[in-house]
Amino acid sequence: TTIKLSSDLLMNQEYSLQLSLETNKGTAYYYTRVVSRSNVNAAQYVKFVASFYEKCLDKASAEDLTAYLESDTSSTSTNYTDININSTFAQISWGNLNPQIYRKGIPVVKDINETTASLSVEYQIAALDEDGNQEIYDVTEFYRMRYTETRIMLLDFKRSVSQVFEESSISISDKGLLLGVRDKNVEYMMNENAGVLAFVQEGDLWSYSPDDGKFSRIFSFRKETDGDFRDSRYQHNIKIIRVEDNGDVDFVLYGYMNRGVREGYCGVCVYHYSNDQNV
C-alpha cells in the first residue's frame, strides 16, 4: 500500500502520522514518524546493509568486510549471541557454523539525515548440528553508518542471535536442558515438586516433563509449514504466571500480535493451557 501526503511538509521537521484501519472488529490505529529530507542516500544505505549481512555468510566475500570492523584481536570468544563492531572476523563471519539464509530480511530505517543513518534488519539462518539436524536462528542486526563521496563508513554494528527451539534438536545433559544459542536470561517456572517445567524461547512457550521426557509447545505464532516473515517477528513476550502439578500453565502474552483474530494489534492476553486437552 502506498500513501501520498498532500500536506506541505517543512524540510527537516519531524511529524507524527496516525493511520486508521477500519475492520469488522473495530478501528485499528497505527503510528509512525514522517520527515522530509533531501540527499539522505537511503538507497545506498539499504544496499550496504543487505550486502553486509549476506557477505558475512560467505567466507570469501566476508574478507571485504574487515575494512569496516574495529576488531579486538585478543578476543577468543566463540559466542554468537552478542556480536559487535569490535568482534573478530571469525565471529562476524559465523565461525564454524556455516549457516545459510533461511529467510531474508528487510532493512528498516530507524533514523536518517544528510550525513548518517541507523538501520536494522531481522532475518533467519539455518545450519546443521553435529547429527545433521537443521537448526533455525533468529538474527537481529543494527547498523549506524556515515555516507562519504568515496565510501560508506560503518560507525557501529551490533548483532544478536537466538536459536529457535525445536523438538528435533533437543539436547539434555547432566546439567539440564540445553537451549542453544541465546542470552542467559531465561523466563521459566516449575511446579512445586519440579515435575513440570515451563520456559520461553524466542517468543514461544514450551513445557517439559523430566519424568517422561515429554515436550509440549504451548504457544507460538510460528507455523509448522508454509511460514512467512511473521514467524520471526519478535515484538511480543510471555510472562509465566503459574505451573500446576498436572501440567496446566497460566501465562500472559503481551506486545504485538503476529497472527490470529488480533493480528496487527498490540495488547495483553491472559491464557490458561490445559495439559490434558493440549489447548
Where are these regions (language model features)?
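Short, solvent-exposed aromatic-acidic interface loops
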Residues: 35, 156-166
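Surface-exposed, charged secondary-structure patches
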Residues: 1-16, 87-133, 237-245
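A short, surface-exposed beta-strand/turn
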Residues: 131-156, 267-276
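Short, surface-exposed charged micro-motifs
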Residues: 108-109, 142-144, 187, 196-197
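Well-ordered beta-strand positions in beta-sheet-rich domains
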Residues: 2, 29-34, 106, 136-144
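Beta-strand elements of well-folded, non-transmembrane domains
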Residues: 23, 123-127, 149
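Short linear interaction motifs
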Residues: 99-102, 120-136, 166-187, 229-235
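Core segments of small alpha/beta cavity-forming domains
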Residues: 1, 14-97, 172-214, 220-223, ...
